[in-house]
């Protein structure tokens, strides 16, 4: 696997589209606050690009749209309970720490609230179990912290987080999460995400087994989703928007199977925009996928030419977000925005815990 020392950034495509071109009106009651009672029984909207048709199904019907030569590519990143509530050791004042990413040093880049008093040397206590000390202040005001905990009781910091941390739910989910597993995919393995790769939440172990039994390939990549995924686009010209970098990797084995199946006429179906961004980051113009370990800030919007992804499973995204722009790049802006209007009329559930879309 090739190790990259620089962030993958794609060439920006010139476009006359503005951020507002991706706006749609969404009633608050359509923002899903809870997951479906059964993961694979949410609604599924199927967009057929060739015929420009829209079908309405349930998610477990997705198997009917998959061929034996196809391959599903999922993001196996695991959400960490990255929201910590504690007190400042000096004054006892309440504070919140949000973990953004682990650095090579083993320290963490974090967001501290309130942050004004979080100077280098400041320390915070979390229930007497975990202590955080600020070691640096970086661009944007984020704080780098060092953690201290009982290493005899907890083997890793992730075990500490599992014990005392809270899931970093998106701001549009206002209800308390009863079960942490509701915000994890059933195949989540590698800790590191600050948000779930939500397209994968609809799969159950049973549905995946049925899909594999049909002969459909299955491969896992990893992209650790950062909080930047919720960052709004604040510029009018979309090509001027700056994407945050996110760590990813794809193994030799997965890259090889993708290339083999595609060479035989199979489609590569990305499960989620994160898997899609990995595949497009590691592919060459001829569509070949390469095993790479690195960081990507690829920004996909209409005008982008897809190289590796043939179909996409995704959720319904926020207006004017980079994610709805990516979906529009694959299926066409007018087709997608019309489909979103239909979804509102048909009372689909939106965002992280909402319903799904398949683009073929």
Language-model-detected regions and their locations in the chain:
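Surface-exposed, charge/polar-rich loops and edge strands
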Residues: 2-360
């Amino acid at each position: 696997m090739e190790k990259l020392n620089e962030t993958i950034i794609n060439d920006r495509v010139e476009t006359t589209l503005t951020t507002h071109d991706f706006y749609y009106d969404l009633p608050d009651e359509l923002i899903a606050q809870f997951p479906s009672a059964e993961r694979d029984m949410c609604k599924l909207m199927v967009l057929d690009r060739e015929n420009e048709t829209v079908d309405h199904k349930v998610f477990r019907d997705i198997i009917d749209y998959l061929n034996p030569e196809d391959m599903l590519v999922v993001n196996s990143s695991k959400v960490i309970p990255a929201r910590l509530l504690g007190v400042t050791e000096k004054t006892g004042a309440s504070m919140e720490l949000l973990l953004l990413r682990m650095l090579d040093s083993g320290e963490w880049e974090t967001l501290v609230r309130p942050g004004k008093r979080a100077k280098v040397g400041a320390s915070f206590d979390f229930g007497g179990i975990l202590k955080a000390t600020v070691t640096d202040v970086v661009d944007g005001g984020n704080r780098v912290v060092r953690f201290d905990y009982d290493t005899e009781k907890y083997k890793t910091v992730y075990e500490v987080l599992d014990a005392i941390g809270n899931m970093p739910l998106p701001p549009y989910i206002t209800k308390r999460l009863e079960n942490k597993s509701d915000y994890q995919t059933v195949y989540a393995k590698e800790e590191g995400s600050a948000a779930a790769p939500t397209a994968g939440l609809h799969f159950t172990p049973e549905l995946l087994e049925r899909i594999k039994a049909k002969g459909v390939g299955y491969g896992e990549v990893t992209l650790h989703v950062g909080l930047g995924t919720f960052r709004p686009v604040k510029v009018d010209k979309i090509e001027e928007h700056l994407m945050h970098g996110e760590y990813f990797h794809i193994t030799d084995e997965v890259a090889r199977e993708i290339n083999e199946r595609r060479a035989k006429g199979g489609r590569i179906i990305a499960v989620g925009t994160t898997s899609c961004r990995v595949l497009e980051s590691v592919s060459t113009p001829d569509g070949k996928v390469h095993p790479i370990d690195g960081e990507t800030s690829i920004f996909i919007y209409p005008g982008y030419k897809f190289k590796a992804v043939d179909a996409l499973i995704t959720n319904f995204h926020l207006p004017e977000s980079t994610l709805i722009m990516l979906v529009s790049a694959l299926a066409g802006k007018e087709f997608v925005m019309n489909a979103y209007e239909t979804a509102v009329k048909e009372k689909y559930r939106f965002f992280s815990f909402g319903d799904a879309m398949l683009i073929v």
